[in-house]
Amino acid sequence: MSWQTYVDDHLMCDIDGQGQHLAAASIVGHDGSIWAQSASFPQLKPEEITGIMKDFDEPGHLAPTGLYIAGTKYMVIQGESGAVIRGKKGSGGITIKKTGQALVFGIYEEPVTPGQCNMVVERLGDYLIEQGM
C-alpha cells in the first residue's frame, strides 16, 4: 500500500459514516520529508518540523510560543508526552502523532470535533507503530 493510500483512505476518510472529513492530512518523515499528503495540506517549513520534533523530545517546548504549521499559529493543548501533540485554532485544530519513523498530521475544522481528529490520526499512528514504522 502506498503512503498516499494511507492518507486518502485512513486519514481523509468519512469519519463515523457521517460524511465528515479532516480538512487536511499528511504523513511526514522525522526529517521533514513529505511521504504523502492531501491536496489541501499546507506547506510545512523546516523550522516547524524541527520545533515539532524538539517538542516530542522535550515536551512543553512549543507551549510558550505555540505550534506553527505553514506560518499558522495553533495554541498547544494537552497531548500525550512524547507521543501526541495537539493544537487548537478557533473552531479547528490539529493532531500530530509520532511513530518510529514518521509524523501523522490531521487538521480539522467544524463540524469535525477534536476527538474525531484524535481518533483518526492516532488510530493510523498506532497501526504504523505496530508495523514497525
From Swiss-Prot:
Gene Ontology MF terms:
actin monomer binding
The record's Gene Ontology cellular component field reads: cell cortex; cytoskeleton
Q: Where in the cell is it found?
A: Cytoplasm, Cytoskeleton
Q: Which UniProt keywords apply?
A: Actin-binding, Allergen, Cytoplasm, Cytoskeleton
Q: Which Pfam families match?
A: Profilin (PF00235)
PROSITE patterns annotated for this entry?
PROFILIN
Instruction: Output the InterPro entries linked to this UniProt entry.
Output: PFN, PFN_euk, PFN_sf, Profilin_CS
- The cysteines joined by S-S bonds are none
Query: Member of which family?
Result: Belongs to the profilin family.
| Subunit comment | Occurs in many kinds of cells as a complex with monomeric actin in a 1:1 ratio.
Q: What does this protein do?
A: Binds to actin and affects the structure of the cytoskeleton. At high concentrations, profilin prevents the polymerization of actin, whereas it enhances it at low concentrations. By binding to PIP2, it inhibits the formation of IP3 and DG.
Q: What is this protein called?
A: Profilin
Q: Which organism is it from?
A: Mercurialis annua
